[in-house]
Structures are given as structure tokens and as C-alpha cells.
Amino acid sequence: TPEERFIYFDKTDFGINKIKTVFPTLLEELKNEFMGKVQYVVDIVSEYEKNKGLIGNRFFNGERPEIINIKCGGDWHNDKCVLIIEAENNQKIVFKPTNKKNIEFLQEIIKMFFDEQKYIELYDSLNINEGYWCRFIEHIENKANVKEFYRNYGKILFLAYILGMNDLHYENMIAHGRFPVISDVETIFSTYISADTKRYYYDAHRKAVSLLSNGTISTGLLPVFSMVEYFGGDVSCLSNTGMKVKVQKIKNLGRDDMCIYDEYEIIKTYLHLPYNEVEPLNFVDDILKGFEEATEIWKTKKDEAKYVILKKGKSVESRIILAMSKAYSKICRMRSEVAYREDFKKYEKLIEKLKSFGDYDAIRFSCERIALINGNIPCYYWNESANPVYTYLKKNRINISISSHLKIEDIWKIILNQVSSENIIRQKQYIEDTIQTTKAMVARPEEKSIMLSNRNRTECSPEKIKSEYKKVVDNIIHQVVEGKDGTVEWIGLTVAEQDQLAYQVVDSGIYKGNSGLGILLIQYYILFKDEKVANILGELVHTYSVKERKGLYDTMETSFYNGLTGIYYFLQKYIAVYENKEAVLLKEKI
């Protein structure tokens, strides 16, 4: 039987010998992938034993509990990851192999905005050579004070905004009673540094990236509905719908024909929520209230904040995101697939594809190749005294060719601009709009069916459609980013709740690229002869022309909305309305 054959393979060397024959280098590969990680865990256990007294006094009320279990708490970088130590008497502690100065810096800032000592102590740390120990944050439900939780969330959002933090998705925050606790403090200043390292092709591009990367949207604390399909769900800390992810399962376990297969599942986690059934998107008013409170506190604490940022900010080591970690994770997982274990050159070709996602030189690519082959996610850092951007390989720090010219004094000036009255008003509008947009566009299935049935009952007379057109175009014009060089860009369209119908009546395709927007604006101009729209259309043509001259279309895909086909179709429509030499020449080149 299949079960008996499995027992035979399991109890004899037949299976192992067969694996050695089919995968002759597998054991050596596994050794290279795991030895560094195993040694890291052994070293941290040794550090725990050596510092048990200090750790016990700081975190365990003087007790010195023995280790019972160890869990990995995240991705592996350079053969290191967050470790959760489970000890006697249900006690836990966390070890993080990252810069100990970051959490100390953040704790100093948090003290200015929160009075509760118990909350401030949640960011306590104990430093050692390889990183630091910190408290294990328990998820504590609190149904009675949900509004207060989201008011505190608004204050944390303000702090993340001014400190240029990002990647604060649902896995990097824990709800602890009335308070949200940040569990990943590595991205302090990251958005500022990332924006400074980018290559800008025209002025509207520079302005759009600055508005987006230096805004509340980039923190990860707000939903971005346009990224839901890419990630399989809302990854922000305001999500409670779960993530659609591909998981590996075993079929026919305990039989000789058992195999691994992939299946999509909705994975739900509630650690970032004050309780499981809460609908975070309903608390926008409380989030805004907390954001406003933090803004007022800043006005009274600005001098104190300046001292902390200029003095302690110099020691911050900021993790810089140069590429989507999802791509790295996928390549790491694929290393375990039979096809890539059998043919290493095939895996090398897979890694080569990374070059199409960013600016790669030989050093950066070599570092990422080594990291991925050894089962690690590539990671990059910045520190004021260590420009350019760097990564780690074993004990060595490797500089790559991406640099930032920012100093802490420059970051302070950026922060002052962030808290200007104009920018605070803009950010509050972003907060409200992004949440309302997500409610409209990422509704639950039952809510969507109600929305669609309501839409079907709506009479779309010519006058109604014209009215809805005006609403849509007003929003497009309101959110346009115009450069000094006559270029134009959009950072995304947010939809107020009362304008949901307008977007449904006109065309959902306008979300799918600037060419789609251009076609919509041409149709609008034909109807209303609006000169502002005419100017934006001319700037869009000029922007496409600038991109073509800089070679950005040489390897561009040919899809309709985001590719060359869409641009060509837009230009064809535009030329039918305007006699424009730049558009005609560009159409021929496209």
C-alpha cells in the first residue's frame, strides 16, 4: 500500500540515497543556507544566558527564567531575524538584531506626545553588541475604549509622518489595550532618504514623488486601495478583511505519493486591532482628532524635538526599501521548488529578472544574489556618517552606488516643512480621502452587491452623466501635480464618499493609468471646451514626449492603460482635436 511504502522509505536509507542521486548538491546547499542561521540562534541563546541577570531585572521583575522555546518573528536578513524567546512561567522576551539607537530615539519622541508611563515603558530596551532585547508586546483587546485607541492611532500616524517612517503594515503594529505599539522601528527617516536617492526624469515626477513619499499615505498606516490587488488585500493597520495569500500544503501525508501543492487562502490576523470585529475604517474622525492633537503638542514641544532629532538622530540607522520585499520573498520561496533545485542556472536566471525593477550595479546585484541563494531577504541601510547606502554580508558592511546627500540638519528642515499649516491641511484631507476611498472601492462582497444594486437603480440621463463628468474631472484637476518644466503627473485619485457614484457612472478604467485619464479629459473637453483641461492635456503630451526622449519607453510594455498602446490611442484622440506637432511626432515614434 502507499502507506507501507512510505514506512519503508522512512525507515531505510533508500529515500535519502535517492535524494542524493537526484539532487547531488542539495545537502551542501542546505548547509550553506542554514548553518549561519543556526549559529545565530546559538549565539543569542548564549547571550541570554550570559546576561540573564540584567534581562531578569529589566523585564522579569528580578526573575531569571530558563528558555523553553524559540520562535522566528519575521524575515531573515543576513542570516539574522527577530527572535521571540519563550521562558518559564509564560514569560516572553524579544531579541532584535538591529541598531539599538533607533528604539531609544523613538522612545524619546514618544515621551513628548504621550503622558502614560506604562505606554512609554513598552519601548524599553536592553542593548548588547549584536542588537537589543525588548519587551514582548501582548495583544490586549479593549472594546470599551476603541475610539480612544484610534485617537492614539492618529497621534502615532503624526509621529510616523514627521519622522519619515514607512512599512508600518499590519504585521508591524500591535494593539495593546488603548494603545497601538510600533513593533518595527527600523524605517525612521526612510521616506526622506529614499526620495533623495531616486532618479527624477522631470519636475512633475519629482514633485509627485515628494508629495507621496513625504506624506501620511507612505507610512503604511493608511490603506491604499490601488495596491490591494497586488498584495492580495489591504496591508495597512486599518485592515480587518484578511489577506489572500498562496500557501503550501501537503497532500497524501504519510503515503509514498505525498506531494506539496499551492492553494490560495484568506489569512486573517487581528493583533493590530483593538478587537476582532472592529471596523477600523469607521473611526476616521477619531484618527483625525488624534492627528490634530499631536499637531498641537508639536507646537509646544518643537524645541525639545529639535534637540532630540539633531542630537540622537545622527545615530539612527534607517532601513531603505529599494524594491518590493514581495518579489524577494517569492524568489526565496521558489528556491525550494524541485525545478530550481535540479537546475541552479534556472534559479540564477530568475534572480537576473530583479535588474528590471531598479537601478542595479554589479555590487548591488552580487549582494542580492548571495543573499537570496542563502535564503535571506536583501536589506539596505543609511546612516548620516556612513553615506552611501549599504548592506551587510556576514560581518562586512558593503557600500552600493546609491547615495543620499541628506544630513540630519536637512531632515530637520524637511520636518519643519511637513508640519507647515498648508501640509497639515493636505495630510488631513489625505487621511479622510484614502479611508473613504477604501470603504468605497474595497467593500465586502455583501456591501458591493448593495452598492451595485443601488447603482443599477440610478437613472443615468444625459444631464446626470454630464454632472457626474464634472465631479470626476474636478477631482482630477484638483489632484494634478504640475511641474515647472511643463510636465504633469498624478499620485493617485482619492474618492470622497459622496462621489462614489460619479466614478462608477463614468468609467472605472480611469484608475488604470495616465493615458486613461487623458482620454477621459479629451472627451470632457469636447463636451465643455474647458481651457484648464486643455492646458493639462497639452502638459500630458509634453510629459510623454520628455519620457520618450529620456528612453523610458525603450522597454515599456504594450498594454493599453499603462503601456504604449494606451499612449498611442490617447495621442490619436488628441491629434483629432488639436493640431499639435509635438503630439504628431511622438505618435510616429511610439
Regions found by a protein language model. Give the residues of each.
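Conserved ATP-binding subdomain of kinase catalytic cores across diverse folds
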Residues: T1-M165, F179
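Alpha-solenoid helical-repeat scaffolds
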Residues: K147, E459, E463-K466, Q504-Y511, ...
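Well-ordered alpha-helical segments within folded domains of soluble proteins
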Residues: Y132, N152, S449, D507-Q523, ...
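C-terminal catalytic region of ATP-dependent kinase domains
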Residues: E3, T12-V42, F179-E468
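Catalytic-loop Lys-Pro-X-Asn motif of eukaryotic-like protein kinases
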Residues: Y170
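Low-complexity, Ser/Thr/Pro/Gly-enriched N-terminal "stalk/linker" regions
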Residues: Q436-D507, K512, L520-Q523, L527, ...
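Long, well-ordered core segments of solenoidal/helical folds
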Residues: E468-T487, K532-Y553, Y578-I590
